[in-house]
Amino acid sequence: MPSSKTPDRLAGDDALARGAWSEARDAFDADLRRRETPEALEGLALAAWWLDLADQVFDSRERAYRLYLAGDEPRGAARVAVWLGWDYWAFRGEPAVANGWLQRARRLLEDQPPCAERAWLDVREGSFLLLEEGDPERALVLAANGIRVARDVGHVDYEMLGRAVQGLSLVTSGAVAEGMRGLDEVNAAVVAGELTDLVAIGLSCCYMINACERVRDYDRAVQWCTRLKAFSAKWGLRPLFAVCRTQYASICLWRGGWLEAEQELNAASQELSASRPAMTGDALVRLAELRRRQGRLIDAGDLLEQAGQQGLALLGRAELAFDRNDSRGAAEQAARYLRHVPTANRTERAAGLDLVVRALTDLADRDGAKTALAELSSIATVVATAPLRAAASFAAGYAALGEGESDAARQHLEDAVDLFVQSGAPFEVARARTELARALAALERFDAAAEEFRRAIALFAELKAGHEEARALRFLDALPPAEAGSGETSPAGKPETSPSAAENCGLTRREIEVLRLVAAGLSNQMLGERLFLSEHTVHRHVANIMNKLSVSTRAAAVAQAARLGLLA
């Protein structure tokens, strides 16, 4: 049976309700000096949790768990076991141990009638499956169970928290409108004062921001970040905001506020490393992304090493490899990331697919790039937010450019520019303008290409994105004088020929372009400058041409092409 409340325990409970964490800790300490009870240990653990005193959190909760078991109170033991599951995940980064505690709680509750502890377990396990394993389908099942039980037993806080997990799971799976409606409802209940549990209130806001970031709905995210920051300051919820501010930094990064992003990430990293070291990886990965965009590739690599092997770190390494012209490494790392993300987790797959399309295009893996692009385009259609549609258009344009479909590339990349502008993403706008300029140059529209390169360079310079600025400048410098050509001929100066001969030997339009320039005597470096491709990509195209023509040298490829009428 629960022990009766002493004056010190009553004072501790009152202090917890007011967010007076140190006062609560002192009150529960005083109560425990008289007699050790699981209830007082629970209160002490919660105060220590908000104060980021990890050792005291674990010690108090594990003692409370043992006392509840010894007193034949399975519901109390299960409640604490759920908390311990969260603690082992958040403080120590041990998901296997965390899952063990969650399953122990489930075993303790299997013979119990519907109760608040069962709702708490379902909601927390659902969030664990979503945030740790990226599984929105199983998370939805558990969230629905938790909502039903919480409603039946009249626990509004757990019901709303369950709806928040449900909303985030729906957004993650691509049902953005439905998921956001649910999250809006939960946070309206928060604003209206329907919730009293500070943990449920804080997590509901965090899940809203997380959902906004996943679909890049940054206008909505800014509003909720501002509200959460004020709420955290009022109640002294520093650890809660330290986690969520890393997501706020992504908003700053997306919108071009790189100085603010850096300040937020440095502050979050320092706070988390002192109290929740297992959760610093996310902040380190985001800081690495900032460094990568700034062109500080060595610094980015060092930060990613510190971040370990979490999913976003894999994606960061893939992007870094791509920037270093290691398309094979980029493709492999991105594919590794995607193997960890279930297909139902559409929003988290999108970024990996975008990179796979670009890397495989550079490797001349036409089928692989096409498959990845089809999935990315499908996700963009389902999610339907402007940033994801922009990403799909950008990837489609990049792939078309790699295949020599220059006019199709132009159209896709124009759409990408427009959508990124609409989304308020200057770095992405500049990247899209760079690729659009390459497409225009391939069409020999050199004046228009130069203008797009200059616009991209101006944006990169404003952002201080040195690596991308230098790349765009190299492309601009490689443009021939405007009067060198303005007709509809190919970059080799030859008219387009009938595709029948090329199709018979399996050559793509891009490979025909490369072959004609090889015949004209251009080196791989000169070819890359003419076609605005990396030297590595040119090498892959030449290797594919020789393979398809069944020859072993460039000279033999040119001779075979002449016999087939491909150079006419």
Regions flagged by a language model, labelled:
Residues 11-17, 39-54, 78-94, 117-135, ...:
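Tandem amphipathic alpha-helical repeat scaffolds
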Residues 25-33, 62-73, 86, 102-110, ...:
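Amphipathic alpha-helical segments of tetratricopeptide repeats
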Residues 21-22, 54, 74, 94-95, ...:
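TPR-repeat structural position
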Residues 24, 57, 97-98, 139, ...:
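Single-residue signature of alpha-solenoid repeat helices
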Residues 402, 411, 435, 477, ...:
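Helix-turn-helix DNA-binding segment
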Residues 60, 452, 541-544:
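Residues within the DNA-recognition helix of helix-turn-helix
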